[in-house]
């Protein structure tokens, strides 16, 4: 089995499990899949990628709340919301100069999840973070399976 097939197998199994966990815990399954996606898309892997993805997802949640709360200060002035969105989007990109915030798509995923979750960060954050852990488990269990499979195929048969 190649690496892609191994990752596909573990991702399929754990995706089904995630669906059940999300429903059981009252979480947003779609937001969890954004967390999974963030880990898979992050250029860094392992624990470093997990940490960077988590930091960027959480920063996106915060930035979305800044836009939502800031726009609500003067709801009759629509342009304020547009200007805030532009400024915050700029800052979301600029923050990437810091290593822990260097995965820009993760920041936007966190913000999008917060907008879609209507600003309910107490529901969005655990959904994203648990989904992120599932993404880590999906990819790394697939890599483990591929390495184990490769190792078992490379061991020569011993005859008696």
Where in the sequence are the language-model features?
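Interhelical loops and loop-helix junctions of multi-pass membrane transporters/channels
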Residues: 1, 8, 76-79, 83, ...
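Short, amphipathic, aromatic/basic-enriched membrane-interface segments that mark the entry/exit
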Residues: 1-4, 20-25, 47-55, 72-77, ...
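Alpha-helical transmembrane segments and their membrane-interface boundaries
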Residues: 1-44, 120, 124-125, 134-146, ...
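Hydrophobic faces of alpha-helical transmembrane segments in multi-pass integral membrane proteins
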Residues: 6-18, 51, 55-67, 84-92, ...
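Structural signature of hydrophobic alpha-helical transmembrane segments
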Residues: 19-33, 68-86
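Membrane-interfacial segments
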Residues: 25-26, 71-79, 99-104, 141-153
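Pore- and pathway-forming membrane helices of multi-pass small-molecule/ion transporters and channels
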Residues: 27-44, 86-120
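Canonical alpha-helical transmembrane segments
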Residues: 37-53, 65
């Amino acid at each position: 089995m190649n690496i892609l097939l191994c990752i596909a197998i573990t991702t399929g199994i754990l995706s089904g499990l995630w669906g059940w966990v999300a429903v059981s815990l009252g979480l947003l399954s779609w937001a969890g899949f954004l967390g999974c996606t963030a880990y898979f898309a992050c250029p860094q892997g392992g624990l470093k990628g997990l940490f960077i993805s988590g930091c960027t997802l959480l920063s996106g949640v915060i930035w979305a709340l800044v836009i939502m709360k800031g726009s609500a200060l003067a709801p009759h002035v629509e342009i304020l919301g547009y200007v805030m969105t532009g400024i915050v989007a700029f800052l979301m990109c600029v923050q990437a100069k810091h290593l822990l915030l260097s995965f820009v798509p993760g920041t936007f995923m966190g913000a999008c999840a917060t907008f879609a979750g209507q600003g309910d960060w107490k529901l969005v954050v655990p959904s994203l973070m648990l989904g992120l852990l599932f993404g880590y488990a999906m990819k790394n269990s697939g890599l483990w399976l591929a390495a184990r499979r490769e190792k078992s195929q490379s061991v020569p048969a011993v005859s008696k």
